[in-house]
Amino acid sequence: MEYMINRVNHKNYGWLVDMGNFLCADEDPQHAVGIAAPYAVHAHVKDFIFKKGTEDMPAGRWITTRGGNYIRGTVVGHGVVPVRPCMNILKRAGYNGYVSVEFEGAEDTLAALNQALEYLRRVDA
C-alpha cells in the first residue's frame, strides 16, 4: 500500500485506515496503524473477539483469519483491538478527520453503536 500511495503521489489518494481489519491478516493493529497513519484519509474503528486457531472453532459467525485464527465482531472497546493506542497514533501522525464506527457483532446494533460512541468519547477525551 505504501508503495502504491507513493507512486500515485496525489493529495486525493490515501489510506482508509481500518484498525480492526488488520486482525483478519493476523497483523498487529497498533503496528499496522503506525505504518498507515501518515497516509490516512479516513479511519474506521471496529473491534473483534479473538480465539487462537489451536482451539476448536466456536459456533456462530466467526471469521477464519489468514493465519487460521478466529475472530468475531463485537462492540468497540469490548475486544482485542487496541483502539486508544491506534487513535493516538493517528493523532500523532496529524490525522484529524472523521472516524466511522463499524459494527459486525452479534449484539443489538443500536445498543452496540451507543456503547461504541460512549467509549470513543472517553478515548478521545
Predicted regions and their residues:
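Histidine-acidic metal/acid-base catalytic patches
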Residues: 1-125
